[in-house]
Swiss-Prot record:
Organism field: Picrophilus torridus (strain ATCC 700027 / DSM 9790 / JCM 10055 / NBRC 100828 / KAW 2/3)
Cysteines joined through disulfide linkages: none
Catalytic temperature dependence: Optimum temperature is 70 degrees Celsius.
SUPFAM superfamilies: Ribosomal protein S5 domain 2-like
Pathway field: Isoprenoid biosynthesis; isopentenyl diphosphate biosynthesis via mevalonate pathway
UniProt record similarity statement: Belongs to the mevalonate 3,5-bisphosphate decarboxylase family.
This protein's name: Mevalonate 3,5-bisphosphate decarboxylase
Lineage of the organism: Archaea, Methanobacteriati, Thermoplasmatota, Thermoplasmata, Thermoplasmatales
InterPro entries per UniProt: Mev_decarb, MVD-like_N, MVD_Decarboxylase, Ribosomal_Su5_D2-typ_SF, Ribsml_uS5_D2-typ_fold_subgr
Claim: Thylakoid is one of the keywords in the record: no
Protein task: Catalyzes the ATP-independent decarboxylation of (R)-mevalonate 3,5-bisphosphate to isopentenyl phosphate. Functions in an alternative mevalonate pathway, only present in extreme acidophiles of the Thermoplasmatales order, which passes through mevalonate 3-phosphate rather than mevalonate 5-phosphate. Shows no detectable decarboxylase activity on mevalonate, mevalonate 3-phosphate, mevalonate 5-phosphate or mevalonate 5-pyrophosphate.
GO molecular-function term, one example from the UniProt record: carboxy-lyase activity
Reaction catalysis annotation: (R)-3,5-bisphosphomevalonate + H(+) = isopentenyl phosphate + phosphate + CO2
């Protein structure tokens, strides 16, 4: 892992030199007991994805990753801190064991580091623009919205508006939440040996963005622990090293948009091969048929790319709205147009 730390430090220094990244500030608790705070968050689509943790307890990944936030869905969270009692989490109107376990891990970190002795109440609601799908980054939206609401209730509004600090808190809920909290086109800096407050998400830029379209897809196959499967592949270490080299290449090319979109498509194929090599087969016929359809048509379009994650939904991207629309219409794709989200909410109710 020493060489990965060296590559990671090189990337960190490059980002510091560009002036787009800084280690997160830390805050002291100033808890607003019995007051309710509301915040929202948005899902992400991974351009340059991550699988595998260096430090699973603190959700520090083995390498950096790049993603962008979308408005395919959104998440609203309310948080209230009580002086005593038990933690309570309501998800879409019901108790949810999955999110309770994830929240308890993050709250355990919060209580230990900041010496907080209190109970937390959360009400979480996902708002979808599609009926049901896997792979459109909903867990990232939950993590970032929850982190914002917690930051407001525990540390105050200044902390809740500090994207670096919110990203830091979100990472302890979900790795993908780190980039959702940063917003727009963002990178999560992570590598073996990185300092805890340094492993955060940050916005790469606000301009020169792109256009995208989602094909939401359900899957009958349960997504198990993809991180463990990926790490068990005999190709994993080579894949990890290639990630660092590609990120360095992307930075040296000033985060060229079309270069990142092209890398994203290549990364999707490598990710699929990596998972299949470890026996993790989640890709169904319907998904593969659409991938073939998209791929066979790309030669007729100079500026269209697509990607997907371990979930089966697919996102088509282009720097040209006209080219993307022509591609979607010509192939008669069934999905939804997306935009970069504009409105972040943090408020006391």
């Amino acid at each position: 892992m020493n060489d990965l730390n060296v590559y990671g430090e090189k990337i960190r220094n490059m980002l510091l030199e560009l002036g787009i990244y800084n280690k997160s500030d830390d805050y002291s608790p100033d808890i607003k007991y019995n007051k309710t705070f509301h915040a929202n968050g948005y899902p992400i689509t991974g351009l340059y994805k991550f699988l595998g943790y260096y430090d699973r307890d603190n959700n520090i990944a083995n390498f950096p990753s790049i993603s962008f936030t979308t408005n395919f869905s959104s998440c609203d969270v309310t948080c209230r801190v009580l002086r005593s009692g038990n933690d309570r989490i309501i998800f879409n109107g019901k108790n949810n064991e999955k999110y309770y376990k994830r929240a308890e891990k993050a709250l355990s970190f919060l209580r230990k580091k900041y010496r907080i002795d209190a109970a937390f109440e959360f009400n979480i609601r996902i708002n979808r623009r599609y009926r049901d799908a896997k792979g459109l980054g909903e867990s990232a939206a939950v993590a970032s919205a929850t982190a914002r609401a917690v930051a407001a209730a525990v540390f105050g509004m200044d902390a809740a508006k500090d994207r670096g600090f919110v990203s830091y808190l979100a990472r302890h809920v979900s790795g993908s939440g780190t980039r959702s909290a940063a917003g727009n086109l963002s990178m999560w800096l992570s590598y073996p040996g990185i300092d805890d407050l340094s492993s955060i998400g940050f916005e790469i830029r606000k301009d020169d963005l792109f256009h995208f379209y989602a094909i939401p897809m359900r899957s009958r196959i349960e997504t198990l622990n993809a991180h463990d499967y990926a790490s068990s592949s005999i190709f994993y270490n080579a894949w990890v090293k290639s990630k660092f080299f590609d990120i360095i290449d992307i930075i040296e090319n000033k985060f060229n948009t079309r270069m990142m979109l092209e890398y994203s498509m290549k990364d999707m194929y490598r990710l699929q091969a990596l998972l299949i090599s470890s026996g993790y087969i989640i890709y169904e016929k319907h998904y593969l048929d659409i991938i073939r359809k998209l791929r066979s048509s790309l030669n007729n379009y100079k500026n269209v790319y697509f990607t997907s994650d371990t979930g089966t939904s697919i996102v088509v991207m282009s720097t040209s709205m006209n080219e993307l629309s022509r591609f979607v219409n010509d192939l008669d794709l069934d999905g939804i147009s997306g935009n970069f989200p504009e409105k972040i909410i943090i408020e006391e109710l």
